[in-house]
């Protein structure tokens, strides 16, 4: 064996050991979250009673609901009607929708609704200003009068009690933000939409629930989420220099010791992407932004005096969640080297463990989400498609990482809608 081959063998073996350690760590994380969610009391996993304020309506905070819209003419009518159904005292509820340079009739539709809806404020940003959703929300923040800011996306349909379910957490002065649960209403539109529906069940009912239950570190998720207005202004609003303003704000709140809560019963419904192309575009944006957040905040998180050692470890694992699919691609390359005889694994058993952990952790979380989300047999059969989709995620996360390395420019890109919200909800 040449020195070059020996060097390659050593490198491959070292990388394989590193991957095994990484996959074991994330497997344990998936398992802990799944056990936490599956063993939770019924009151935390199903629709529960709302605890009204004992002192009465007079103690309720004022609320500003914000939505950023760009080319959302297919859903904007339903959005306005859904906001009109929110169950909260009218004198304490403000609604602001920002048209972010739309070119498809969204602006005209919003102006029509504003003329007939006295409590709706419509703001217009000229096209070409940049900054994406963050900049649009910051525009709304300048006009907001509410104590609590609640953000929805344009395709979302919040349930009527969602505002009350959010604001009840702010009786605790330590709480700075609250994340609700989003469910998919169009799972039957395609295999991709069905997989996204399962992924959302796992993401909210298992991962987000587990982070809250085990570490008290849920994420502020960007839609169906609320934040204390004074805190948001104190940290400078949303960051217009990132395409995932939610992850960025989550980390800025954590770094100053603020508390984020997750309310599994604060539900709204949204439209999932229906094609692989749209899935790629959406998840690429998530990966690009999340990886940027890892670069921006990982050192600050690790040195944060507000966090315990376990909280720092969990925050680092959360930060690098969109790096793990890249490890899938590295593992695939290693498998190719082993299969072609260019390199050999140290131990065949270790190779088996590596590939098992690669899929078992995510499947544990997805399986728990399938059960807790009340999914049917069609959804269970669709689980088989998660394996190829996992490799797709690995490819897009790798591309996002490489594009950042070479400093390829990327602007915020909205998710295309297919139709108005009239599909069956998967909750």
Regions found by a protein language model. Give the residues of each.
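A conserved acidic beta->alpha catalytic loop
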Residues: 90, 99-108, 127-130, 157
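Acidic helix N-cap motif at the loop->helix transition within catalytic regions
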Residues: 77, 104-112, 124, 161
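Membrane-embedded multi-pass helical conduit in multi-pass membrane proteins
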Residues: 37-40, 47-50, 55, 318-407
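Catalytic donor-sugar/metal-binding loop of nucleotide-sugar-dependent glycosyltransferases
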Residues: 250-268
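N-terminal signal-anchor transmembrane helix
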Residues: 32-92
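Acidic donor-binding loop at a coil-to-helix junction in glycosyltransferase catalytic cores
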Residues: 243-249
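Long helical/loop segments within the catalytic core of UDP-sugar-dependent glycosyltransferases
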Residues: 114-126, 130-147, 160-243, 280, ...
């Amino acid at each position: 064996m040449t020195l070059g081959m020996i060097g390659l063998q050593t490198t491959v073996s070292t990388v394989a050991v590193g991957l095994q350690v990484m996959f074991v760590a994330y497997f344990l994380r998936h398992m802990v979250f799944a056990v936490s969610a599956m063993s939770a009391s019924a009151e935390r996993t199903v629709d529960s009673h709302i605890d009204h304020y004992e002192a009465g309506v007079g103690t309720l905070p004022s609320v500003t609901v914000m939505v950023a819209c760009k080319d959302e003419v297919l859903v904007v009518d339903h959005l306005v009607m859904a906001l009109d159904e929110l169950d909260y005292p009218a004198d304490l509820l403000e609604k602001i929708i920002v048209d972010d340079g739309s070119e498809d009739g969204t602006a005209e539709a919003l102006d029509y609704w504003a003329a007939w809806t006295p409590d709706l404020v419509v703001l217009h940003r000229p096209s070409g200003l940049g900054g994406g959703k963050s900049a649009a929300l910051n525009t709304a923040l300048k006009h907001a009068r509410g104590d609590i800011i609640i953000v929805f996306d344009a395709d979302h349909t919040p349930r009527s009690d969602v505002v009350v379910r959010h604001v009840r957490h702010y009786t605790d002065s330590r709480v700075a933000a609250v994340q609700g649960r989003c469910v998919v209403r169009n799972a039957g539109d395609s295999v991709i939409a069905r997989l996204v529906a399962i992924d959302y069940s796992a993401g909210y009912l298992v991962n987000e629930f587990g982070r809250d239950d085990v570490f008290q570190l849920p994420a502020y998720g960007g839609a169906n989420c609320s934040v204390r207005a004074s805190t948001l202004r104190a940290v400078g609003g949303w960051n217009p220099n990132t395409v995932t303003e939610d992850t960025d704000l989550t980390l800025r709140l954590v770094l100053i010791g603020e508390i984020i809560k997750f309310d599994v019963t604060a539900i709204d419904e949204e439209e999932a992407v229906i094609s692989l192309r749209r899935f790629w575009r959406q998840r690429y944006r998530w990966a690009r932004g999340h990886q940027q957040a890892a670069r921006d905040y990982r050192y600050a998180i690790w040195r944060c005096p507000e966090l315990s050692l376990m909280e720092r470890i969990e925050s680092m694992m959360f930060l690098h969640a969109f790096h793990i699919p890249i490890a899938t691609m590295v593992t695939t390359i290693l498998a190719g080297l082993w299969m072609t005889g260019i390199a050999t694994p140290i131990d065949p058993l270790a190779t088996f463990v590596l590939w098992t952990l690669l899929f078992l952790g995510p499947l544990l979380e997805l399986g728990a989400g399938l059960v807790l989300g009340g999914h049917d047999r069609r959804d269970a059969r669709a689980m088989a498609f998660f394996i190829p989709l996992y490799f797709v995620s690995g490819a897009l996360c790798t591309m996002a990482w490489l594009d950042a390395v070479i400093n390829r420019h990327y602007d915020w890109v909205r998710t295309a809608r297919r139709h108005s919200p009239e599909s069956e909800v998967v909750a």
